[in-house]
């Protein structure tokens, strides 16, 4: 309806604030989780108004990925990485998906690979969402812009923003 397809979630460590990661490189965390905001697995909730469960035997949800929205999202990710690169950031886009399991995610990745050809000055890579959950604990400073489906972005952005918050005194 409003075309608000890109949810931009910055994750940044701030100087002189002790965060939850012990590695000294943690002070260099400055990344963006870019989540698609109108499709993905949350599409079912939007379409069906978060219906209560009325069938105790089986329920299905839809992970909707469209070419039109995904192309816009990936282009936005690469343009954001280019803008950040001009300000001294990494200038890298990571496509976070589960393409090895879901056909919808395989399409998401395929479109990413097509769109990256228009941004040859920007480094790009893939990472499965479960591996990314671990990588963001091990070495979050190695990422710049991460683009993903709505639910994955929701989970990772909430989880990893917490890592950069101050610890209790």
Where are these regions (language model features)?
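Active-site rim loops that border cofactor/substrate pockets in soluble metabolic enzymes
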Residues: 105-146, 150, 154-155
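Solvent-exposed alpha-helices and their adjacent loops that cap or buttress functional pockets
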Residues: 2, 22-27, 86-88, 116-118, ...
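Conserved small/polar residues in nucleotide/adenosyl-binding loops
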Residues: 161-167
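N-terminal glycine-rich phosphate/adenylate-binding segment common to multiple enzyme folds
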Residues: 1-63, 151
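Glycine/threonine-rich flexible loop motifs
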Residues: 156-160
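Glycine-rich phosphate/diphosphate-binding loop of Rossmann-like nucleotide-binding domains
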Residues: 55-127
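Short, ordered loop/turn segments at secondary-structure junctions
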Residues: 13, 98-99, 129, 151
């Amino acid at each position: 309806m409003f075309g608000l397809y890109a949810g931009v979630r910055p994750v940044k460590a701030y100087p002189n604030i002790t965060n939850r990661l012990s590695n000294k490189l943690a002070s260099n965390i400055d990344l963006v989780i870019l989540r698609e905001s109108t499709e993905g697995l949350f599409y079912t909730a939007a379409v069906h108004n978060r219906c209560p469960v009325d069938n105790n035997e089986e329920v299905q949800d839809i992970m909707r990925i469209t070419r039109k929205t995904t192309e816009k999202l990936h282009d936005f990710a690469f343009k954001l990485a280019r803008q950040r690169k001009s300000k001294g950031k990494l200038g890298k886009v990571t496509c976070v998906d589960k393409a090895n399991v879901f056909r919808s995610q395989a399409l998401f990745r395929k479109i990413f690979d097509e769109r990256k050809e228009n941004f040859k000055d920007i480094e790009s890579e893939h990472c499965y969402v479960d591996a990314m959950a671990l990588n963001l604990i091990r070495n979050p400073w190695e990422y710049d812009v991460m683009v993903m489906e709505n639910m994955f972005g929701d989970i990772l952005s909430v989880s990893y923003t917490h890592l950069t918050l101050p610890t209790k005194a």
